[in-house]
Swiss-Prot record:
It is a multi-pass membrane protein. The transmembrane segment S4 functions as a voltage-sensor and is characterized by a series of positively charged amino acids at every third position. Channel opening and closing is effected by a conformation change that affects the position and orientation of the voltage-sensor paddle formed by S3 and S4 within the membrane. A transmembrane electric field that is positive inside would push the positively charged S4 segment outwards, thereby opening the pore, while a field that is negative inside would pull the S4 segment inwards and close the pore. A motif (Selectivity filter) lies at residues 370-375. It is found in: Cell membrane; Cytoplasm. It comes from Rattus norvegicus. It comes from the Eukaryota. Keywords: Cell membrane, Cytoplasm, Ion channel, Ion transport, Membrane, Potassium, Potassium channel, Potassium transport, Transmembrane, Transmembrane helix, Transport, Voltage-gated channel. This is Voltage-gated potassium channel regulatory subunit KCNG3. The gene is Kcng3. The chain crosses the membrane at residues 166-187, 218-239, 251-271, 282-302, 318-339, 385-413. InterPro entries: BTB/POZ_dom (IPR000210), Ion_trans_dom (IPR005821), K_chnl_volt-dep_Kv (IPR003968), K_chnl_volt-dep_Kv5/Kv9 (IPR003971), SKP1/BTB/POZ_sf (IPR011333), T1-type_BTB (IPR003131), VG_K_chnl (IPR028325), Volt_channel_dom_sf (IPR027359). Belongs to the potassium channel family. G (TC 1.A.1.2) subfamily. Kv6.3/KCNG3 sub-subfamily.
Amino acid sequence: MTFGRGGAASVVLNVGGARYSLSRELLKDFPLRRVSRLHGCRSERDVLEVCDDYDRERNEYFFDRHSEAFGFILLYVRGHGKLRFAPRMCELSFYNEMIYWGLEGAHLEYCCQRRLDDRMSDTHTFHAAEELGREQPRPTGPEAAPSRRWLERMRRTFEEPTSSLAAQILASVSVVFVIVSMVVLCASTLPDWRAAAADNRSLDDRSRYSASPGREPSGIIEAICIGWFTAECIVRFIVSKNKCEFVKRPLNIIDLLAITPYYISVLMTVFTGENSQLQRAGVTLRVLRMMRIFWVIKLARHFIGLQTLGLTLKRCYREMVMLLVFICVAMAIFSALSQLLEHGLDLETSNKDFASIPAACWWVIISMTTVGYGDMYPITVPGRILGGVCVVSGIVLLALPITFIYHSFVQCYHELKFRSARYSRSLSAEFLN
């Protein structure tokens, strides 16, 4: 190190007001990369790229960082303990101090690594919300500001049900349409409903009616609901900030998949009329139109509970996959053993319900989930003992991830509540004047 006072045997590090004296020999191989970089500095400019300020007279290097965090880090690199978070300090702030001085998250103790992972997972949702809700550059011009504010009002009205009174009314109307559509869809499958509809049509029109919407009161209600959802989707697309992001959202994809079959059936009715092509397509169209049941997922846009469930499943997908693997392994073992004990050992008095391993898999799933339909059950003593072990194993396996999923659900709920309150405050501040 050629910069600084050549005769000084030590240097002074001033970190947030706390002064530490180090010998020059220690700088070259010092465990903290930022401190060791001082050894190679040749000019004051090089020094200021490493630290925040430098006092030539005192040979003192000033770092505008957290002094308490540096004290913990310095004790760790000197071998006087294990690296843990400083008390009364945010985990992310301490982690930023570690990155600044040249340490990685792996240097933390395992318990602190878990706390850091949890905190980083907590903030991931807020970073995504801030990225999506970040304001676009304000356009210039005499009419730019009113136009932008009007589009922003419309977007908040359609995207944030709690942002204003108009948004709450619009959300309530949308929920009513979803419920009405679901009720009509379910009622249309009742035998009495279909019989009453058949009495109002001629025998020749029955097959055609199954693929042609709009001929009965249920069809009229369906057309009104489709019209509302179509208009809502179009308006939301027009006022959205990012059109590509709008198309990629799962709820919008569900809207498109639920609306499209209706228009396909209408177009086929118009262009094919009464020929056999429409009759052959009737089954396909009925399957597609049954996708309207997914409209119930639209309620997630208006109810924070469904949003919490979706976010919890997204965060806990690793635990879900792990649980699925456990169940599959247990199902393979118990189904093979039950088939052997109930059918494979004694063919004369064998249990026909366990004639194959795939057939036994159904019994294993029902037993592990403690449902117990009773449609098939073991009759031999070894088979019943195996059934008891299967039930107990299922209870244990299903209970393993419950605690983690519960805490994740509560955490996601509080996050979404906080985000909703933050959006409401930002809306009031933006449109108050």
